[in-house]
């Protein structure tokens, strides 16, 4: 990697995120500065391609306005540089980034995407992502952020809530709510109970935080073991912002080892688990190399025919 530039979207204290219109405006406002910062590292580099996330997932109907900001910037840069602009999805970017230094073996795998906007278990077979399960209401990251904000922590609350959780004790007070043979889950009931604990003020903040991470680990462990039993796939790659938590990694690994010892659970680097452009860049590089290989074959066959 030559350079990596990031800037969190500013969220006012007490709020649990941004509306789409606010997020689009903030992306449009912040992207030029990030590109200027990035350009300082590229003085001796030749840019051969650009890649951008065009939509959240692989499905054609998948759409969020905020992705138009990055896609527009990418296409504009590519046009000015006269290089190809490749498109991918936010979810594929997460999975690709999580592969870096994860130790995941080549072949089929189960991919788990856990964030504030996604809680899904998918199979990745022959480069095809297929949805197997997920949440039926709240996302894992929403539970973390709503708990943290209610406790007076900044948004995004993950790192701050984890600091509390490592000092707390869990007694599995939040029941796991599963559906469809364990492939799908409900998290809204647990979040309601957490808000009740916070309002009552009778339970230590550290224990509340620990109960949240314990619940998420138990839930994800059940989902991946159910997916493994359905598909026969024995390796799992967990990506997304929630997966950057060291505590969550330890808990879900321990839980899964007890439930299904032959299931290998892998994570990427913590810094590549949350939102980042590393996976998107790797996808763009691969697509460019594939394009170049096709050109060589085409030119080679043309020369042979002469």
What positions do the PLM features span?
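A contiguous, well-structured pocket-lining segment that forms one wall/lid of small-molecule binding clefts
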Residues: 163-236, 242-257, 285-291
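Phosphate- and other anionic-substrate recognition elements at nucleic-acid/protein interfaces
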Residues: 34-35, 44-46, 55-85
């Amino acid at each position: 990697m030559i350079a990596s530039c990031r800037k969190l979207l500013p969220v006012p204290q007490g709020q649990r995120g941004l509306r789409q219109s606010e997020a689009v405006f903030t992306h449009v406002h912040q992207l030029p500065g990030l590109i200027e910062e990035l350009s300082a590292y590229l003085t001796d580099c030749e840019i051969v391609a650009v890649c951008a996330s065009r939509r959240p997932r692989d499905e054609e109907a998948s759409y969020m306005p905020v992705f138009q900001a990055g896609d527009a910037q990418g296409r504009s840069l590519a046009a000015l540089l006269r290089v190809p602009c490749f498109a991918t999805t936010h979810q594929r970017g997460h999975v690709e980034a999580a592969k870096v230094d994860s130790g995941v073996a080549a072949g089929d795998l189960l991919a788990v995407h856990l964030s504030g906007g996604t809680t899904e278990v998918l199979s990745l077979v022959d480069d095809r992502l297929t949805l197997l399960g997920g949440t039926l209401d709240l996302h894992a990251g929403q539970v973390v952020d709503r708990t943290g904000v209610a406790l007076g922590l900044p948004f995004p609350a993950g790192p701050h809530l984890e600091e509390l959780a490592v000092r707390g004790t869990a007694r599995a007070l939040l029941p796991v709510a599963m559906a469809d043979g364990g492939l799908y889950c409900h998290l809204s009931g647990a979040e309601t109970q957490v808000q009740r604990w916070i309002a009552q003020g009778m339970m230590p903040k550290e224990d509340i935080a620990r109960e949240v991470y314990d619940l998420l680990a138990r839930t994800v462990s059940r989902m991946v073991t159910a997916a493994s039993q359905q598909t026969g796939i024995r390796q799992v790659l967990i990506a997304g912002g929630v997966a950057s938590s060291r505590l969550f990694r330890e808990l879900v690994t321990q839980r899964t080892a007890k439930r299904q010892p032959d299931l290998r659970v892998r994570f990427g680097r913590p810094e590549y688990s949350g939102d980042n452009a590393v996976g998107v860049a790797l996808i763009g590089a691969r697509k460019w190399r594939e394009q170049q290989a096709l050109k060589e074959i085409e030119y080679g066959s043309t020369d042979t025919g002469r």
